Amino acid sequence: MAQVWKDAEISLDPIKDQTVAVIGYGIQGDAQANNMKDSGLKVVVGLKEGGSSWKKAASDGHRVLTVAEACKEADIIHVLVPDMIQAQLYRDEMGPNISKGKALSFSHAAAIHWKWIEAPSDVDVIMVAPKGPGSKVRETYLEGFGTPSIVAVEQDSTGGAWDRTLGLGKAIGSARAGLIKTTFKEEVETDWFGEQADLCGGSATMVVSAFETLVEAGYQPEIAYFEVLHELKLIVDMIQKYGINGMWRRVSETARYGGLTRGPMVMDSHTKERMGKVLKEIQDGTFNEEWVSSYRKDGRDAFDKYMKELDSHQIEQVGRKMRKMMWPDSTE
């Protein structure tokens, strides 16, 4: 079983006099920086000068600096910009201003694990990764609780890397729920696998296939949309809150029997074998090489071209109409 730390076990003392530079002020940067500040840490925010994020961070009461200035001043540099800009940002602004004894901190392990960034040997390399969106990280903190985080130390140069890691987890509010020990390798491989095989790739592809099956059999697209896509959230919410068996106990008896007996016909041993192939390509670096190469060559078009194809699919055309019925004021 994984090791878990709780709030009462952790002290902020080891980092209370250290300055934390939060690099980036998107959804996670906003939430984590404000939680740290409210927990009493010395926080600066490192951003591109003059942008909308700069104004937002300043209006939230933060001292805002350029990325280079923030890294030079801080003891802990907490990197919360998108994965694919981290390497260049590190080369241009962060790396030249990171000196012995500082800590490089992340909320995702990819840049370090795949060596997009190669940290010097005389700094700590740590991770605090909340398992929820930034809005939830902030919301649960303000409610007096927190969003769990997974935590790891890749490099302990100072001997105090774990104190820094756990202190950040406490300041973010995550220790109130629990800090779960992991490794950089485990975080990125399981995170990418979940995104590809289940959460994003697998579930979206399954929904499209189910929709096509019904429409090709002569059913109305609008009805198919409701049955295979719209109602999915109800089931996922139950699974998240009550577990898989808890979901089975809360659906109709017909849904329970049909799902338990027919589900394995859809997701069978061959599906699991293909999932294994997806995992292997993550583990051996095949996917990383493909992704980085595609992004360097095509930028956002590396994935936009697939999304453009889906935009013309019937499930999206019908979906836009159905969503307008339920949320007339929403924009997509």
From Swiss-Prot:
The keyword Calcium does not apply. Its cofactor is Mg(2+). It holds the Pfam family KARI_C. Binds 2 magnesium ions per subunit. Substrate binds at residue 252. It catalyses: (2R)-2,3-dihydroxy-3-methylbutanoate + NADP(+) = (2S)-2-acetolactate + NADPH + H(+); (2R,3R)-2,3-dihydroxy-3-methylpentanoate + NADP(+) = (S)-2-ethyl-2-hydroxy-3-oxobutanoate + NADPH + H(+). Keywords: Amino-acid biosynthesis, Branched-chain amino acid biosynthesis, Magnesium, Metal-binding, NADP, Oxidoreductase. GO terms for molecular function: ketol-acid reductoisomerase activity; magnesium ion binding; NADP binding. Residues 183-329 form the KARI C-terminal knotted domain. NADP(+) binds at residues 25-28, 48, 53, 83-86, 134. The active site is at residue 108. SUPFAM superfamilies: 6-phosphogluconate dehydrogenase C-terminal domain-like, NAD(P)-binding Rossmann-fold domains. Transmembrane segments: none annotated. The keyword DNA damage does not apply. Mg(2+) 1 binds at residues 191, 195. GO terms for biological process: isoleucine biosynthetic process; L-valine biosynthetic process. Residues 1-182 form the KARI N-terminal Rossmann domain. Mg(2+) 2 binds at residues 191, 227, 231. This is Ketol-acid reductoisomerase (NADP(+)). It comes from Cenarchaeum symbiosum (strain A).
